[in-house]
């Protein structure tokens, strides 16, 4: 089955619910937001690939879901991502030209079993026409 925008949004909510209950040993003690973001992006992409067919993005293309014209961002609720997605003044004024699916998480470490948990508080879709500053 091909991945649709509706599927992406519904699956993001379900993935967030499941991931918020998952204890992950590889994230224990990790404070690098980029590492957490990479982990979550890859896990969500793999989750979707088990259920749907879609074109996966790459660094050269710049967006994670090219067929849907959507990029994925992951940010901490405690320390929101400070990187700017705009590559030009035009994008800042008129928008990125693509939509975003944004996961907002709060990470907790559990020393007793050396795991971490990402409580995903929001999985938000932002339409392309809403991505301007």
Predicted regions and their residues:
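Nucleic-acid endonuclease domains
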Residues: 1-66, 74-133
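Acidic/His-rich structured neighborhood in mature extracellular/periplasmic domains
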Residues: 70
């Amino acid at each position: 089955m091909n991945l649709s925008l509706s599927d992406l949004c519904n699956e993001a909510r379900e993935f967030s619910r499941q991931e918020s209950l998952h204890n992950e040993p590889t994230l224990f003690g990790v404070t690098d937001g980029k590492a957490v973001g990479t982990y979550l992006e890859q896990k969500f992409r793999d989750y979707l690939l088990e259920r749907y067919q879609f074109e996966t993005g790459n660094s050269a293309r710049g967006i994670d879901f090219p067929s849907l014209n959507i990029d994925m961002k992951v940010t901490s609720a405690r320390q929101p991502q400070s990187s700017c997605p705009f590559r030009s003044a035009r994008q800042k004024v008129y928008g990125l030209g693509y939509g975003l699916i944004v996961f907002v998480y709060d990470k907790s470490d559990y020393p007793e079993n050396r795991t971490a948990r990402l409580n995903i508080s929001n999985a938000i879709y932002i339409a392309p026409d809403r991505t301007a500053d």
